């Protein structure tokens, strides 16, 4: 479900799949062919979240931000089940494993 937050609304334009139980909130930009799976929350209430094309955020994940600390997920990234990404940057063609926790200002490079 998409939710506006204040004056920001999600841009889910060409996403491949958003599960009915996923919540996309605020200033979120989903790239082409991106998927967000069941019971995942992507909440951009304090800063922007950008998820690149071809990426997938699997079941039960949380993607969030802090004030002035956006979350940026590159192209062709897989985020495994139950992961938490908070105010971090993940480079292109990367895999974030199941249950991983990435907190503010963490940077994961390309091809990781």
Residue ranges and their predicted role:
Residues 14, 19-20, 25-26, 31-32, ...:
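Left-handed beta-helix
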Residues 1-16:
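Extreme N-terminal tail/first-helix region
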Residues 2-4, 24, 48:
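Residue-level preference for alpha-helix termini and adjacent loops
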């Amino acid at each position: 479900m998409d939710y506006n937050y204040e004056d920001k609304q999600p841009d889910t334009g060409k996403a491949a799949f958003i599960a009915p139980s996923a919540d996309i909130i605020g200033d979120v930009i989903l790239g082409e062919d991106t998927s967000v799976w069941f019971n995942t929350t992507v909440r951009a209430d304090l800063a922007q979240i950008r998820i690149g094309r071809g990426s997938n955020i699997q079941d039960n994940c949380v993607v969030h931000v802090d004030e002035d600390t956006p979350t940026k997920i590159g192209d062709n990234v897989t985020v495994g089940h139950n992961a938490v990404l908070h105010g971090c940057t993940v480079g292109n063609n990367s895999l974030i494993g199941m249950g991983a926790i990435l907190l503010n200002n963490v940077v994961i490079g390309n091809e990781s």
